[in-house]
Amino acid sequence: GSTGTPKAVVVSHRCVIDFISCFVETFNITSEENIANQAPFDFDVSIKDIFSGVFTGATVHLVPKMFFSFPTKLLDFLEERNITTLIWAVSALCIISSLDGFSYKVPSSLKKIMFSGEVMPVKHIHNWQKFITNAKYVTHYGPTEITCNCTYHIINEVIPEDGIIPMGIPFKNERVFLLDENNKLITEPGINGEVCVSGTCVAPGYYNNWDKTNSVFTQNPLEIRRFERIYRTGDLAKYG
């Protein structure tokens, strides 16, 4: 996990392979792309950088950590390396917009800007869209326990200043659904429920912690005729 005490999530090779194969297909990542790696290698977001390159032949550029304290150096790096693709934490994108980085330089080669890890403030996505108009903007949602992400939303609409960016739709190798406090499926809009995930993305569990594993990696209560393992995220969501 990214905050607090490390959760020590065990993620299998199969989970990574299945997720990345869907990821590169969904976003049409090719060998022509230059990806700027922002996430440390002990953070799950880095899986998308590393293995997108391995799967497709795209070039992965390692951004020096210190550059994220100096937006001018960071923007120079993106321009000099002809970076086409960012798969960054929200906070990294906000550094540039909050410090008015685009008044110094607007990278000309960016085509795909993807982000995850926390809610993107609308004012920051508006700032990026104002200066980089031809890029595809995509938000990702999902915890480490389901191998990085389980949903995505391509931002084609104008998000109101007081609005929020939707979680989006599931990747094709995953099923995402909402359960109420009685483990009943929620299908109506506007009703809060716990986000639950099934599919080949679900991790085996937590290293050497069976009690915690068994509390959130459970049998799907909607399936009574066959075994289906799900991850209960603890996050609440509702259909719009």
Residues of each region from the PLM?
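A generic "structured core" feature
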Residues: 1-12, 16-19, 29, 35, ...
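Nucleotide-sugar-dependent glycosyltransferase donor-binding/catalytic pocket residues
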Residues: 5, 43, 67, 121, ...
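Gly/Ser/Thr-rich phosphate-binding loop
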Residues: 55-58, 83-87, 93, 97-166, ...
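AMP-dependent adenylate-forming
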Residues: 16, 130-139, 154-240
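Conserved AMP-binding/adenylation subdomain of ANL enzymes
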Residues: 7-36, 40, 44-84, 157
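GHKL-family ATP-binding catalytic core of two-component histidine kinases
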Residues: 10-12, 44, 89, 121, ...
